[in-house]
Amino acid sequence: MTQDELKQLVGQAAADYVIANVPEGTIIGVGTGSTANCFIDALAAHKARFRGAVSSSVATTARLQSHGIPVFDLNDIESLPVYVDGADEIDHGGAMIKGGGGALTREKIVASVAEKFLCIADASKVVDVLGQFPLPVEVVPMARTAIGRRVTALGGVPIVRVTKDGAPFLTDNGNEIIDVKGLRITDPRTLEAHVNAWPGVVTVGLFAARGADLCLLGTQKGVETIVYPNR
């Protein structure tokens, strides 16, 4: 199977999981990206079972609404039974790098409210040590250079994310992103807390303090379910 086919496979598996494990009439959290889009597309056939969704980005909101799935503001929701999202990398303990699509802050906010984080990914995203995928850091624009110096001091290579026309990429929150290359992240929880404490950082794309509870992993043999018991 191609990578796109694996994404569709786990997207359908996630929809099946939600249907089987989440009570009817509830609201679910939905992430951002190509794998999350496959989940949205698979969930659309069963949208009548749920009140709707909380979205992690403008793009996801548009995708949900295109299927007629109601989108709720997180401020109006007390809790979410599950948050479903992909990952750029995931280690064997359920810690992830996320933010390749630029929605890391809203993804982290929605995930923090959910009772369960269901990660959906293909097998290529599983790593022994996080860091081969550049680590996104969302920053307030005026802090970009200062944060870049801190990243360099850690041994990373900071690269400001730009659009196709060379302008700084802006998140849905109006901030910029520094993608950090060259890190070998052996202690993701500690690094997450450390970088998040820097003035000017909105959030870092490490999801370790609130990592995945389980992962539906697309492989050439089918979907593998991985549970992270220490979460």
From Swiss-Prot:
Which annotated residues bind substrate?
32-35, 85-88, 98-101, 125
What SUPFAM superfamilies does this protein's entry cite? D-ribose-5-phosphate isomerase (RpiA), lid domain (SSF75445), NagB/RpiA/CoA transferase-like (SSF100950)
Cited Gene3D superfamilies: 3.30.70.260, 3.40.50.1360
* EC number assigned by the record: 5.3.1.6
Reaction(s) catalysed (UniProt annotation)? aldehydo-D-ribose 5-phosphate = D-ribulose 5-phosphate
What keywords is this UniProt entry annotated with? Answer: Isomerase
Assembly, in brief, is: Homodimer.
Q: What HAMAP family does the record tag this protein with?
A: Rib_5P_isom_A
In Swiss-Prot or TrEMBL terms, this protein is called Ribose-5-phosphate isomerase A
Species annotation = Paraburkholderia phymatum (strain DSM 17167 / CIP 108236 / LMG 21445 / STM815)
